[in-house]
Amino acid sequence: MPFTLGQRWISDTESELGLGTVVAVDARTVTLLFPSTGENRLYARSDSPVTRVMFNPGDTITSHDGWQMQVEEVKEENGLLTYIGTRLDTEESGVALREVFLDSKLVFSKPQDRLFAGQIDRMDRFALRYRARKYSSEQFRMPYSGLRGQRTSLIPHQLNIAHDVGRRHAPRVLLADEVGLGKTIEAGMILHQQLLSGAAERVLIIVPETLQHQWLVEMLRRFNLRFALFDDERYAEAQHDAYNPFDTEQLVICSLDFARRSKQRLEHLCEAEWDLLVVDEAHHLVWSEDAPSREYQAIEQLAEHVPGVLLLTATPEQLGMESHFARLRLLDPNRFHDFAQFVEEQKNYRPVADAVAMLLAGNKLSNDELNMLGEMIGEQDIEPLLQAANSDSEDAQSARQELVSMLMDRHGTSRVLFRNTRNGVKGFPKRELHTIKLPLPTQYQTAIKVSGIMGARKSAEDRARDMLYPERIYQEFEGDNATWWNFDPRVEWLMGYLTSHRSQKVLVICAKAATALQLEQVLREREGIRAAVFHEGMSIIERDRAAAWFAEEDTGAQVLLCSEIGSEGRNFQFASHMVMFDLPFNPDLLEQRIGRLDRIGQAHDIQIHVPYLEKTAQSVLVRWYHEGLDAFEHTCPTGRTIYDSVYNDLINYLASPDQTEGFDDLIKNCREQHEALKAQLEQGRDRLLEIHSNGGEKAQALAESIEEQDDDTNLIAFAMNLFDIIGINQDDRGDNMIVLTPSDHMLVPDFPGLSEDGITITFDREVALAREDAQFITWEHPLIRNGLDLILSGDTGSSTISLLKNKALPVGTLLVELIYVVEAQAPKQLQLNRFLPPTPVRMLLDKNGNNLAAQVEFETFNRQLNAVNRHTGSKLVNAVQQDVHAILQLGEAQIEKSARALIDAARNEADEKLSAELSRLEALRAVNPNIRDDELTAIESNRQQVMESLDQAGWRLDALRLIVVTHQ
C-alpha cells in the first residue's frame, strides 16, 4: 500500500477520529496524525486498517478554514491529490485545494462517501435499515394508524369514535357513553392518534382530584403516554425553571380544584398553548344563564384558549337539558348561544330519527317517504341513491346505510356529541348480589357506644363515616395494634369462602389500605391463602407486579386485596368474583368498584358478595343501594342525583343505624324516584345519536382489520432483529412473554424505554390485557418507534458490501443495490405521512444500468449473499471505485421517473381526499350549523400547505450495497 507524507486516510475501525494525515513512513510502519483529536496511530504498512480518502467530481468538500468547494477536477502529483473547483461562498471558480488542507473533522454522511471511505457496515444492518424504511412507510399508510398501539380490547364502538374524532383538526366533542363503556379509553385513543400524527403536541387533562392517579395509570399503561401530575408542590417547583410552570412539560394532568383555586395559576394554564384539553366528569360543571359556577367559568376560560377540547360526561340528560346545553356551549359558544333555541331544535330532530329507523327497518318505502327523505337530505343528485335503497338489488342495504350516514351528518349534534348505551352495545355480563348478614361483635358494640358518647359534638356526616368502618372505631380506643380481625365475623366468613372456592380468582375491595394489608397477613398466616395487595402507598411498578401475580393462572395469587384509591384505573375482567369487605360512601364509588370486573369482554356473570354487620351503617347502606337504587345488580345512572336529593336523611340514618323509623319509606321513595328517572332517561334516548356513535358494520370491520394486523408476524421478526442489532438481550419466558435487558455492548448507551432492570414484553394483545407487567409491543410502541428513529436518523446500515456466490455469472461481476428515499419535508401537524411517508425505492443495477429489482426480491436475494469483513471490503471498494461511480450515475438518471410517479400519486390522493372532505363539510354547513367555521378554514389551509409541500418533495440515496460475484 503506497503511503506518502501529507496524504489523507481514515481509520476503518475508529472512524470517530476523523481524517488522518500521514506524518511518518518507514520500511515497515506508517504513522497517522488525527488533528481533530490530536491523537497518533502507528500501523503496519503491509496490512493497515485504513482507507485512502479520495473525492470525485461533483462532491462537496470543506477546507480546514471552513469554506466549501464543489469539486470539478482531481489532479494527482507524487501521490498527493489537489482538488480544483468552485467555492460555494464566493462562487470563485478554478480554486485549488490540496488534500493536506482538508477539514479533519470531515463526517461521511452520504452512503457512497461512507463506502469509499471504508466505513462499511455489517450486512445485517443494511437489511435492517431497508426493512425499517419499508415497514415504517407501510405503517403510515394504514387507514387505522394510531389505533393499534393501545393495550385495550378491540371494541367496535370505541374504535369508531376514536377513528372519527382522532383524525379531525382540533376536535371539540362531548363523549357521553354510559358508565362502563370506556370513555377514558376513547379519550386516550383520540389523544394517542393526535400525538402520533403530530396533530397535537401539548395536552392538558383536568379531572376530579380522586381520579388523577387513575388517569395517570391509564394513560401510561394503555397508551404509553407519560403524563406529569401537577399539584401545589410540583407547580411551586416548576416556577424555578420557567416563567410559566406549565411550559416545563408537554403532557399534564391536574385536578379541577387545583386549576380554579388560584387566578394566577389559571392564567398560566390559559397561556401555556395547549393543543388539546380533556375534562373528565364534566357533568359536575354547574351552569345557569344567570350564575355559572366558578368551576364552569375556569373551564370556559381554558376552552377559549385551547383549539381541541374533549369533555367526558355521564349521561347527558341525567342532569337536565340546561346542563347538557351548558357543556355543548363550552365546545362551540357561537353555535350554542341560546338555550330556548336549542330546546326547539332538539324537538325537531324527531322526524329525522323516525326516518333513520324507517331505513334501518328494511321495509319498502312509499313515495311520500321517499320525497320526505329527499327533502331532508337536500342534495340534487340523491334520486339514484333513493331508488337503489328501495330496490331488491344487492346494493339496497349499502344504499340505505349511505342515506342513514347522510341524514346523521346533516342533522342533530352528532358531530359534537357521542353517546353509546349498554342497551346498544352487546357483551355485558349479568351481576348477581349475595348479601351475608353477620352479628355485630360485643367488642364493636362497646367501641361504638363509647365513640357515641365521646363524639357527641361530631357532625352527622363524620359520625356516619365512622359508623361505616367499626374496626377503625375499635382501633381508635385500643390502639393501632388492636387485633380486630380475631373477632370480626367478616374475616371468618372471608376465610371460609376463599378456602371453599380455591379455584376462583377473587377481588376483595375495602376502603382503606391498612385494612387490605391486615387482611393479607391474616389470610396468609391462618390459611396459607396466596393474596396480593394493591393500595395507594405502592408504586405503579409494585402494583403492576401484584396485578400480574393475581393474573397468573396456576401459580398466581388467588386473591387480590385492593384499597379504594389503589384500585382506581385497574380492570380485572379475568376474575368474576368480588367481595366488598365494606361499602363505599356514595353510589359513584360503588359503581367504580363493580366496574373493576363489569367490563365489556367479561366472560362470566359477576358474583358480588357483601358480608355486612347488622345494626351498623353497613346494614343501612346495603339496603339503600340494593332496594332503593338497584345499584348492585344494574348500573345506576340515577344514583348521584338521588343521593344528592336525600343526602341529609341518609346521613342521619348512617350516623344512627339503630334509629330505623321512616327508613322503609325513604327506600320506597328512592326506588320510585329511581324508576321514574330511569323511564325518563330511556324515553329521552336519542336513537339517532346512538346509531351514529355505535358505528355499526363500519366499526365492526375496523375492529376486524386491526385484529388481522395483530396476527402479522413481520413485526415479531423485525423487532427481534432490531433488538439484536441494538444489543438488547432477549430472554424467552414462555406464555408469549420475553424479558428485554440492556447488554454491555449497546449501539447507544441508554436506549429510551429500556430501564436498567429490563422490561417484560409481549406481542399478544390478550396476554397484554391479562398481564399488566408486560408491555404490549406494536408498530406504535415507543420501543419500536425509538428503534426505528435510532436506525433511520443515523447512518447505521447505509453502506455495505457482500459476496454473491453464483457460477452462472462471471467472477468479479458487479451489482449495486441502491435504496433511495422519496420524501417531503413539512411541519408534523400537516400529517403529510398520510400521503407521502418517507418511501423507499429499491434498485439493483448491473454495470449497464439494467434494474433487476423487480426480478430479484429483496429477502430472497439477501439470503444468497455472504458477508465480507471491513478490511477486505475496503480493498475491494478501492479496486472498483470508478465502476461503482459509473453505476451510481446510471441510478441517479433512473430514479427520477420512479420518484416522480410516487410524488404525483401522493399529490392526486391528497388533492382528492382533502378537496372531498372540504366539499362535504361546505355542503353540510348549509344544513348543519355544528360544522365550525374554523374547521373549514383549517382544512382549506391544510390542503394548500400539503399541496405546496408535495410540490417540493424530493429524493435522496439512503443506503447502498456493493455486490461482487465470486465462485468460491
Curated annotation (Swiss-Prot):
Keywords: Activator, ATP-binding, DNA-binding, Helicase, Hydrolase, Nucleotide-binding, Transcription, Transcription regulation
Domain Helicase C-terminal: 490-662
Residue positions binding ATP: D177, E178, V179, G180, L181, G182, K183, T184
Transmembrane keyword on record: no
TM ranges: none
Entry-linked SMART domains: DEXDc, HELICc
Enzyme Commission code(s) on record: 3.6.4.-
Record GO terms (molecular function): ATP binding; ATP hydrolysis activity; bacterial-type RNA polymerase core enzyme binding; chromatin binding; DNA binding; helicase activity; nucleic acid binding; nucleosome array spacer activity
Keyword check for DNA-binding: yes
Effect on the protein upon substituting K183A: Loss of function. Still interacts with RNAP
Residue positions of motif DEAH box: 280-283
Xref: Gene3D superfamilies: 2.30.30.140, 2.30.30.930, 3.30.360.80, 6.10.140.1500, 6.10.140.2230, P-loop containing nucleotide triphosphate hydrolases (3.40.50.300), Tandem AAA-ATPase domain (3.40.50.10810)
GO cellular component, one term: cytoplasm
Domain Helicase ATP-binding: 164-334
Record-linked InterPro entries: Helicase_ATP-bd, Helicase_C-like, Helicase_RapA, P-loop_NTPase, RapA_C, SNF2-like_sf, SNF2/RAD54-like_C, SNF2_N
Pfam families named in the record: Helicase_C, RapA_C, SNF2-rel_dom, Tudor_1_RapA, Tudor_RapA
Biological processes annotated in GO: positive regulation of DNA-templated transcription; positive regulation of transcription by RNA polymerase II
Family assignment from sequence similarity: Belongs to the SNF2/RAD54 helicase family. RapA subfamily.
Assembly and oligomerization: Interacts with the RNAP. Has a higher affinity for the core RNAP than for the holoenzyme. Its ATPase activity is stimulated by binding to RNAP.
UniProt cross-references to PANTHER family, sorted A to Z: DNA ANNEALING HELICASE AND ENDONUCLEASE ZRANB3 FAMILY MEMBER (PTHR45766), SWI_SNF-RELATED MATRIX-ASSOCIATED ACTIN-DEPENDENT REGULATOR OF CHROMATIN SUBFAMILY A-LIKE PROTEIN 1 (PTHR45766:SF6)
Function as written in the Swiss-Prot or TrEMBL entry: Transcription regulator that activates transcription by stimulating RNA polymerase (RNAP) recycling in case of stress conditions such as supercoiled DNA or high salt concentrations. Probably acts by releasing the RNAP, when it is trapped or immobilized on tightly supercoiled DNA. Does not activate transcription on linear DNA. Probably not involved in DNA repair.
UniProt name for this protein: RNA polymerase-associated protein RapA
Protein source organism: Escherichia coli (strain K12)
